[in-house]
From Swiss-Prot:
Gene giving rise to this polypeptide: BTBD8
Protein name stated in the entry: BTB/POZ domain-containing protein 8
Biological role stated in the UniProt entry: Involved in clathrin-mediated endocytosis at the synapse. Plays a role in neuronal development and in synaptic vesicle recycling in mature neurons, a process required for normal synaptic transmission.
Naturally occurring in which organism (per UniProt): Homo sapiens (Human)
Annotated segments matching region Disordered: 528-554, 581-658, 670-692, 707-768, 788-815, 831-989, 1151-1283, 1519-1607
PANTHER family: BTB_POZ DOMAIN-CONTAINING PROTEIN 8, GH15728P
Amino acid sequence: MARCGEGSAAPMVLLGSAGVCSKGLQRKGPCERRRLKATVSEQLSQDLLRLLREEFHTDVTFSVGCTLFKAHKAVLLARVPDFYFHTIGQTSNSLTNQEPIAVENVEALEFRTFLQIIYSSNRNIKNYEEEILRKKIMEIGISQKQLDISFPKCENSSDCSLQKHEIPEDISDRDDDFISNDNYDLEPASELGEDLLKLYVKPCCPDIDIFVDGKRFKAHRAILSARSSYFAAMLSGCWAESSQEYVTLQGISHVELNVMMHFIYGGTLDIPDKTNVGQILNMADMYGLEGLKEVAIYILRRDYCNFFQKPVPRTLTSILECLIIAHSVGVESLFADCMKWIVKHFARFWSERSFANIPPEIQKSCLNMLIQSLNDKNAAFLLMESDRLIISLPRVKWTEAALTMASQLQEKCIAFIVDNFSKIIQSENFALLLQSQAMSSTADLLDTILKAIEENITTENSCSLLMALDTLLNSDSTKEMGFTCKIQALRDKLWIFLVQSFYAVRHTESWKLMSTDDQQKIQAAAFDKGDDRRLGKKPIFSSSQQRKQVSDSGDIKIKSWRGNNKKECWSYLSTNKKMKSDGLGASGHSSSTNRNSINKTLKQDDVKEKDGTKIASKITKELKTGGKNVSGKPKTVTKSKTENGDKARLENMSPRQVVERSATAAAAATGQKNLLNGKGVRNQEGQISGARPKVLTGNLNVQAKAKPLKKATGKDSPCLSIAGPSSRSTDSSMEFSISTECLDEPKENGSTEEEKPSGHKLSFCDSPGQMMKNSVDSVKNSTVAIKSRPVSRVTNGTSNKKSIHEQDTNVNNSVLKKVSGKGCSEPVPQAILKKRGTSNGCTAAQQRTKSTPSNLTKTQGSQGESPNSVKSSVSSRQSDENVAKLDHNTTTEKQAPKRKMVKQVHTALPKVNAKIVAMPKNLNQSKKGETLNNKDSKQKMPPGQVISKTQPSSQRPLKHETSTVQKSMFHDVRDNNNKDSVSEQKPHKPLINLASEISDAEALQSSCRPDPQKPLNDQEKEKLALECQNISKLDKSLKHELESKQICLDKSETKFPNHKETDDCDAANICCHSVGSDNVNSKFYSTTALKYMVSNPNENSLNSNPVCDLDSTSAGQIHLISDRENQVGRKDTNKQSSIKCVEDVSLCNPERTNGTLNSAQEDKKSKVPVEGLTIPSKLSDESAMDEDKHATADSDVSSKCFSGQLSEKNSPKNMETSESPESHETPETPFVGHWNLSTGVLHQRESPESDTGSATTSSDDIKPRSEDYDAGGSQDDDGSNDRGISKCGTMLCHDFLGRSSSDTSTPEELKIYDSNLRIEVKMKKQSNNDLFQVNSTSDDEIPRKRPEIWSRSAIVHSRERENIPRGSVQFAQEIDQVSSSADETEDERSEAENVAENFSISNPAPQQFQGIINLAFEDATENECREFSATKKFKRSVLLSVDECEELGSDEGEVHTPFQASVDSFSPSDVFDGISHEHHGRTCYSRFSRESEDNILECKQNKGNSVCKNESTVLDLSSIDSSRKNKQSVSATEKKNTIDVLSSRSRQLLREDKKVNNGSNVENDIQQRSKFLDSDVKSQERPCHLDLHQREPNSDIPKNSSTKSLDSFRSQVLPQEGPVKESHSTTTEKANIALSAGDIDDCDTLAQTRMYDHRPSKTLSPIYEMDVIEAFEQKVESETHVTDMDFEDDQHFAKQDWTLLKQLLSEQDSNLDVTNSVPEDLSLAQYLINQTLLLARDSSKPQGITHIDTLNRWSELTSPLDSSASITMASFSSEDCSPQGEWTILELETQH
């Protein structure tokens, strides 16, 4: 047994080398061999016994008595040669095989046993043979002679004696030393084997020959058949081999056959040395020799694997070979053993070069086994081993697989450790890991584990992780090893998470296991420190519940609540705060928790929803009547309503909100409580934010509470708390918080920004300065802490209010003075322009829009940088005229902001975390405060430049952060300011104050119109009276409001020229201040307030107070404005404000209560737009704001609001509204044009929503964003113009095509373009025919519809997307920017974008328009569908869907109704929802394809809107050119213009209608307006508008709204309707604003066009080349040369746009600061660049702080107004932004 001996020797050597294992191997080897021997011998016996029984291939027969026995000569010869000789030998010659051989003297049974022993016995059977022979011989009496003769024969024939003689020798040496020649070197399994083997070795009577490789092997058929199933089959049956004398075998070598034959005969346990064991194993498998397989496996285990004892270097490779052999043959047992061994020693095996040669599937199997083997005990060990392996492996090709596997294993180990951290830290291996890390130079593994834990903190595991970390910290080993600091740092972060996510965490199982001490600490800390920091990764659950604390009105009550029920408050706060932090950490839990806590509230909500209208009316009445307490209660009710989805929040909020409301009432009564009111406003805003905001509202309240509690001063604390929590909430729940902040901020920001516009007179100067400062203060206060805020707020509110009053009075006193005094340099020209175009209200409106865009551009630029920035820019613009006021405000506010800033720094830190750069925000805020001051001073200088420079440096970077924070701060501040003002004003005029607040809100709106509306004052008084009546009878009041408003509007419209001039100036101011801020402000405030009131209980209080708040700053400022204007047209303002507020309240209530009120409101809005461009603008803005508020009310809305702001800044929507963003950023306010209104105002509002909406819409937004760029670019194109319906900002086919062609169009882009074209055509046809039954309606109607679609899209988008329209349109940019700046926003945005992308992805299916591949290019319908789906999919937002739907329905009222139907079909507005720009674009296809018709339409509109010449004039020529050329611009301009036309026309028609239908025909008016809107919307939006018609009835709208919105993301459907109307209004308003801020509008339009151009390029080029940079550059190029960017058409339109821009700029020279200091072209370019930068910034929204800094740089770069600088800046910002801005767009495009 050479092999055996060698094998046994080798193991000995191995053992020797192994050392300790030598004994083990010695034991294991023999044991294995004995087992194998027994197995093989038994098998051999069984085989032969079966052969005997089956009588197979027998050749001899024995006859014993009567019984015959068949046997085999070969076996008998081998086993009993003597017997064979005696029985067969003598007769062998004479007998044939057939003849039986008689065996006598032996019984049959005995002979049978004898044969069985012969065949099966493993022992020597000599004794049996002798016994039988003895009997046989005796009986037969055979002669000795015969015996002698026969014996020799026997010997000769069988060689039995020789064989037996040899075999015993073999056996004696058999153990391991048996080494014999040739065939006997293998050990047989038994005696039987030995005997049979002799037959083979020395062939005896063989009966078959086997030929292999030309060699012959003699064998026996019987034994072959018995031993091998293969041979049994071959040698039996009808095969040829069965009858042949020989067989030839293929695929086997003679060596292998020899081994096989030895086994068949002897059951040998070894194989020759040089034989391939793998081949033997394979052969055994093929020939069915199971025993031989066992032998081969034994050889493999012995020689290759050393029986898997301690690994020896020599065995590593052989084990791998064995593994491969086992795998190839399929030997599972051996393969499993090898795998286990390799897994056990993976570090050594993977480093073997031979491991690289293993098949990849085996390598993967090793890895999988390792991963599956992970447990608590070995995880740390495997982590260390994998790390060791990675370090030790050389970086060469053959180690790549091992390195990859080791890295994957390390990741799995870390993930497992994170998941089972509490158990693993108790294992020995983890202690070893800590020791090894302590001894190593760098504790990389521990750092990695801790980082992974930090990144994977969730509400579910946070408590257990905290306990585990505590255990680690308390262990001696940790202290000794010096890891305490690292672990403590992680614990601190975890603690922050728990504090922020307390609301959700407290419901987890592990929470119950925590120590009560920790639980109490977390619960206590949760209120104040919820947003101190943001974790690196947003927790799974993000909720915006924190927004609840936004309720300012709840502040006072919250204070009392806090004071009286501090513990209870803490609980609520803790709950709410948790929810808020949930925004960061556990929105799901928070949401459920809130709902749980809100269960009772839900009931309230349900009741409220039922009584929502009543409540709303009550609230309105109370607001007007000064029923502050009632207002507070209704707010609570409304809030409950708002918190419909978040009962917990409501619950948390309810008492508090009741208190807040009481406080709000008190705040209304007392100036100090204004702070609370401000908070209430915030809270209401938060609540308005929608389901999430609802939760947020609770959270905000809670935060406010918590902060106040923390603070010692409940009152001061609450407001700031709200702001802080809002920020934190924003931070915590990027989306929710952002929503809240955006809602709050956008609302407040909207109110701030929009207040600015609305208070362009008051707010721009006051608002910008004051608001900026108030906002800054508020922001700072809110950011700093709730602490300063109340004081700051009061101070700000008071001083602001005073200054606002003074300045407002001044503003009101002289429109020009107001314009200049208000820093309305643009508005002044606007006013002049408006005066010039007095006959043309539309022109004035357009001019005002233009000027507004300038302001908006600057303001939005600032705002893009930060709410303060925007305000700053607005302020700076107005600063020229408002410097004194701004300075005053700045001084007061700046001081407050600084104080607040200090406090805010604390709050801001949490908020910074929440806001990405809360600190920077604080700094920014302080900077902004300073900047505001600087800007106030600088604003005297060209605000654009100053803003560009100052804002870029201090505020732009801040803008993202600050804009979010500041926005929320601004909102808070504004709310506070508003509330301060309002509160103060409230005390001044409790009832009138409410009315006044409402009036202020309206007055703000009115205040834009006050001068012109002084005549309106009577009407406004009527309105007020009507409004009071309306408050008494909400529905009636709605109608009355509408009637009175219509009357007022009619009157106002009659007076509109003058009104328009002053109003436009005011509105322009307001518009400039915040895009459509006059609307937004007034309506924003009134709507916000009213919506707050109606939408949120807190908001209800807000309405009293928040209206005061919103209207405070706005109303306060607006009040101041109103005071000014009220002084001028105080009653008018009050009445209008009141009416407006009531209207808003009605709207809010309806929003809250019903789509009906909303519809009414919207009708009002729609009708209000009829009031005048300003009023329409205001109404549009109001609508937009209302929608924003609606959005705020809606969870989506909250998202929207947040998105509106954030989305403007951060949201891809901003990108979508590339133009908008810039407009938003720079012209955030200025973008009062359709885009701006939508974006700046609505989108601001919606922006928050856009955040969730952004989340929902984000991807769409992104696409829209990019599309916006595209749309912008495309819109400039001729195709764009005609089809460049991509006005919407979504790139239309033409836009895309144009872009695609001129830039570079990928097939995908072309495809998209084609789809867009098809879609456009389709849209035209579908939209016109299908969607727009009114399509055949006058082209005029179509443009109107388009604008309506725009507004609707914007609003609907806000609504439906809950923030898509606004967020998508312009606020998307700002939201983007904000989101960009805020991590929260980023997270929200990403979430939103993800949702949106999902929507967009899912929406593509619903795409109504063929061929639209790119969402960005999927214009309205597809985007709408997508957005719709997105919105639908975005259930967070949908949480509020019922209430929001109702609200939305009511808010979006008539518009929503069409959208309900259209939502099903994903009408343009739906798409618009998804991508407001796209929607617009699509709609714009219809619209813009009608844009060509737009000329006609415009003409018609001009005819229809002869009064609205603003649009007609500008729109006809400029606007048509702008529209076409600026189809992108058209989005803004034409949208604005068209919307203006629509709005104006609608207004005019409505006005006419209203004039005709005053009062009694309000419904008809509304319906008419709805019809107009419907027609417009339908024309614009296709089916949606048809739906609009259907939805027209206010009553229907609420139902449809609520149902549809519930169905189709209620908001989406309803939003579509409402938004369409609102959009219409908004668009009108935007158009008005755009028109009124003509320069800005054009600039905006151009900027938008540029942006659109950029977007198309971005969308088209970006796909292949265009990033944000490209987009930016393209924008810049577009700005510098739209012609280059656009196609020839684009160029043509670009020229037109430029011409328009230049005209606008020239008109707006004084207004356009940029124009002032720079040549027109440069100014335009700069303006566009600024917008582009803002958009780019928006594009880079995800980058958050970085973007802010980048934006600062950009701003600084742009500040020179140097084209190259701007371009460079654009490129720079593009790069920063491109990854997420353009990339996302590309991603979305790619998805399609």
